[in-house]
């Protein structure tokens, strides 16, 4: 584990997310993690195209004496290492999450999952040998999309090579929009 440098995360983000920030190495890639509290570990896994900020209100309102909330940014999202579009697959993300789960000392965890973070989170925890003793499921699936699946316009937009790079890397979308709130 290494502490995330404040130079990497903009100051205005750190003010909104006043938690412990650190990076862990998962198979050669840096995964950014936010953590708050003591007690029972509860891992909150976001979906696509989200990041750990999704759980800000949860982090702000859960009693930190009873729960240790652990919020990783999936590889390629938030403040974790960025990857090429072709590297995003359920299998790759599941392996990265399994490596992440192995860094949690406790055998039993609570798990909050959203979107494709559901499949990635559950499969990663199982591969790491974790016992899931509490589960909150939000807008997810337990299987991969079937043939003929049609992605939303936003998912399609995020797959366009030049346009997605401009939006997400050059214009810092959605961070640039969040600054307005």
For each predicted feature, which ranges?
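Conserved residues in the N-terminal Rossmann fold of short-chain dehydrogenase/reductase
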Residues: 23, 71, 113
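Conserved HGGG/HGGXW glycine-rich cap/lid loop of the alpha/beta-hydrolase fold
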Residues: 32-79
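Flexible "cap/lid" subdomain of the alpha/beta-hydrolase fold that forms the substrate-access gate
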Residues: 2-20, 29-33, 49, 54, ...
């Amino acid at each position: 584990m290494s502490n995330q440098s404040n130079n990497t995360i903009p100051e205005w983000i750190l003010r909104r997310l006043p938690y412990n920030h650190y990076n862990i190495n998962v198979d050669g890639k840096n995964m950014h993690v936010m953590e708050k509290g003591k007690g029972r570990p509860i891992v909150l896994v976001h979906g696509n195209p989200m990041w750990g900020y999704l759980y800000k209100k949860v982090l702000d309102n859960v009693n930190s004496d009873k729960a240790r909330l652990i919020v990783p940014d999936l590889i390629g999202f938030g403040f974790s290492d960025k990857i090429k579009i072709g590297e995003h697959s359920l299998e790759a993300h599941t392996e990265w999450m399994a490596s992440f789960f192995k860094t949690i000392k406790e055998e039993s965890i609570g798990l909050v999952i959203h979107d494709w973070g559901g499949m990635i989170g559950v499969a990663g925890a199982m591969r790491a040998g974790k016992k899931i003793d509490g589960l909150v499921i939000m807008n997810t699936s337990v299987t991969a999309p079937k043939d003929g699946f049609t992605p939303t316009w936003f998912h399609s937009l995020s797959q366009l090579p030049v346009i997605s790079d401009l939006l997400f890397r050059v214009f810092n979308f959605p961070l640039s929009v969040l600054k307005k709130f």
